[in-house]
């Protein structure tokens, strides 16, 4: 007769959490920063096609670290949720808070019921008419949700990157300064006391939620992805 081994619920949840954290820690960091011009999303990502940052709806964007197939399925589900809700009710009823709640439920259900948790960490950002109306939500692998202010940092080096950004963040930052600040934080720590080498433009992914998209471009869609030339010009 095969002997049954008992694993306490506490140990099971701890093992699941440790497993997810290890997977996330292997991922390169992502930074989401609220600034005067809107919200800047910056990721260390050498792939030109496998995006860590994406558009969800008019003024809502998504950023993630971890396993690509897992967070991409969540991004697509978020787009479907937003489209259906906006069509069934009103476009103004699609909010970052509502989307974050849906993601929290999905992540929590997978964490407790499936064989393995998702190895992902998400950020949902919504740009407002003013900086005070910006919304930043951070979601972890177990469905925990946090309402963040000013900026969100995710990934294996999150603490180091967050510390660097916290020292330089201010409400008056424009898009160029916000992206520079994010890149300075993402730059690998130097092995000596020399200045850290910046991340090259071809190895980063940058997008913005433009606070003034309706005024400048006449479009409700605030999301805009920057190519290498745009990034170089922005940082010039």
Swiss-Prot record:
Keyword Cytoplasm: yes
Subcellular location: Cytoplasm
Superkingdom field: Bacteria
CDD domains: proteasome_protease_HslV
Cross-referenced Pfam families: Proteasome
One Gene Ontology MF term: threonine-type endopeptidase activity
Main location: cytoplasm
Free-text activity regulation comment from the record: The formation of the proteasomal ATPase ARC-20S proteasome complex, likely via the docking of the C-termini of ARC into the intersubunit pockets in the alpha-rings, may trigger opening of the gate for substrate entry. Interconversion between the open-gate and close-gate conformations leads to a dynamic regulation of the 20S proteasome proteolysis activity.
Keywords recorded for this protein, A-Z: Cytoplasm, Proteasome
Signal sequence residues: none
Biological processes, Gene Ontology terms: modification-dependent protein catabolic process; proteasomal protein catabolic process
Pathway noted in the entry: Protein degradation; proteasomal Pup-dependent pathway
Family annotation (NCBIfam families): 20S_bact_alpha
Function text: Component of the proteasome core, a large protease complex with broad specificity involved in protein degradation.
Complex and partners: The 20S proteasome core is composed of 14 alpha and 14 beta subunits that assemble into four stacked heptameric rings, resulting in a barrel-shaped structure. The two inner rings, each composed of seven catalytic beta subunits, are sandwiched by two outer rings, each composed of seven alpha subunits. The catalytic chamber with the active sites is on the inside of the barrel. Has a gated structure, the ends of the cylinder being occluded by the N-termini of the alpha-subunits. Is capped by the proteasome-associated ATPase, ARC.
Protein name: Proteasome subunit alpha
Source organism phylogeny: Bacteria, Bacillati, Actinomycetota, Actinomycetes, Micrococcales
Recorded name of the encoding gene: prcA
């Amino acid at each position: 007769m095969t002997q049954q081994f008992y694993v306490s619920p506490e140990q099971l949840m701890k093992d699941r959490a440790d497993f997810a954290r290890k997977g996330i820690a292997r991922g390169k960091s992502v930074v989401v920063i609220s600034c005067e011009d809107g919200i800047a999303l910056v990721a260390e990502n050498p792939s030109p096609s496998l995006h860590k940052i994406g558009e969800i709806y008019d003024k809502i964007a998504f950023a993630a670290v971890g396993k690509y197939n897992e967070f991409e399925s969540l991004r697509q589900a978020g787009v479907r949720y937003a489209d259906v809700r906006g069509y069934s009710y009103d476009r103004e009823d699609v909010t970052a808070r509502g989307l974050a709640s849906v993601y929290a439920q999905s992540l929590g259900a997978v964490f407790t019921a499936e064989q393995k948790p998702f190895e992902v960490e998400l950020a949902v950002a919504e740009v407002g008419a003013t900086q005070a109306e910006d919304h930043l939500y951070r979601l972890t692998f177990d469905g925990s949700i946090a309402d963040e202010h000013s900026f969100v940092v995710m990934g294996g080096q999150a603490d180091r990157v967050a510390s660097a950004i916290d020292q330089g963040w201010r409400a008056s930052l424009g898009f160029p300064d916000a992206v520079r600040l994010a890149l300075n934080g993402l730059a690998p720590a130097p092995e000596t006391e020399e200045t850290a080498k910046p991340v090259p433009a071809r190895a980063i992914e940058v997008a913005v939620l433009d606070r003034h998209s309706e005024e400048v471009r006449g479009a409700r869609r605030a999301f805009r992805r920057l190519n290498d030339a745009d990034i170089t010009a922005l940082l010039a």
